[in-house]
Amino acid sequence: MSLEEYFGDWIRVINQKELNIAIDAMNRLYSSKKVCPAAENVFRAFDLCPYNELKVVFVGQDPYPQKDVATGILFGNRADVPEDELSPSLKVVKEAAVNFEIPHNSIIFDQTLESWARQGILMINSALTVEMNKVGSHTMLWRPFIGSLLKNISMSNPGLIYVLFGSQAGTFQPYIQTGTVIKVPHPAYNARTETKMNPELFTGINRELKSKYGITIKWYKEY
């Protein structure tokens, strides 16, 4: 399968030279190291988020470095993970997105976060792979690809919302030429310090989307 066939419309904003360099490095790493996520999930965020429906870009640090945790979707966990065993970062994100401080009926929260991606959020890390148990180990490998990706997206799609989670993601702000850029602490920081992520992040995104496009993101289902 060619890159054009695999990435579909995303190929418009992907620097194929940088991508090929990263893929060559990936092939070497996966054959000699333990790497997260599974190779078939590295580009999963692009598969789930339709390019023509892109509204928001979330950028984190790197995938969960523990075995069988990373899914290729920023902050997402597998559907079969018990609620009390969710990753600390996802617990922080869930609490802010649902905002349990306001009244709710019963809710369903998609812990895979695939539903967010399908609604037009590109959910990527600033490094798409990581060596198992070695946080930040592939940061420089992916930086050229992610940098050019963000620049090309912003030039081709004015008016998007970009959320940069943590200091590493924040270093990519100069690549973003248009749109709204929001910088917030990484939820891992909130988990470590036992602080909360501000729910205004999610309500603010929806206010802007409603104002610009007349739509909002359904962060959870309520019934």
Regions found by a protein language model. Give the residues of each.
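Short, charged low-complexity linker/loop segments at the C-terminal edge of domains
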Residues: 213-215
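A polyanion-binding, active-site-adjacent surface
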Residues: 6-164, 168-176, 180-183, 189-192, ...
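GGW-centered surface loops in extracellular recognition modules
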Residues: 1-4
